[in-house]
Amino acid sequence: MNFEQARSNMVLNQLRANRIRDIDLIEKIEDFPREDLFPKDLKHLSYSDQIITLEQGRFILPPLTSSHLVQCLDLKSDDKVLEVGSGIGTITSIIIQYTTSIDCIESSEALIETFKKSLSENLFQANLLKTSIESFF
């Protein structure tokens, strides 16, 4: 599969066609190989416009949904971000390009391992905490 072409098609047909107007955001997404975050058996879905189901009822949001979320955040370089339910890091990989501080909370040990691997391979640094939401109550 040609992931560069898939990424380009996703930007053109999903993001630009659906009110993602932040040029900086579009460029960041165009330059980042989202497929690198995905397990091998799911890489072919990395640019699809569907929710991808993972273990324990967890899921990966489509690129358009993630992009709308980040666009609405209007992040600045000195913002501090807390991401709960980081999954494999698809949203983290966008946010970390805007800010120097992101703390991530994830309850799935398997997703943490996938996330750590993709963070190190893509030269990201984030604080990652394994916990369950119940531990806060």
Where are these regions (language model features)?
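N-terminal auxiliary segments of SAM/dcSAM-dependent transferases
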Residues: 1-41
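Conserved SAM-binding loop and adjacent beta-strand
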Residues: 20, 35-42, 52-70, 74-75
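Cytosolic histidine kinase catalytic core of two-component systems
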Residues: 23-24, 64, 110
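Substrate-binding/active-site groove segments that recognize
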Residues: 48
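Conserved nucleotide-cofactor-binding alpha/beta core module
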Residues: 74-137
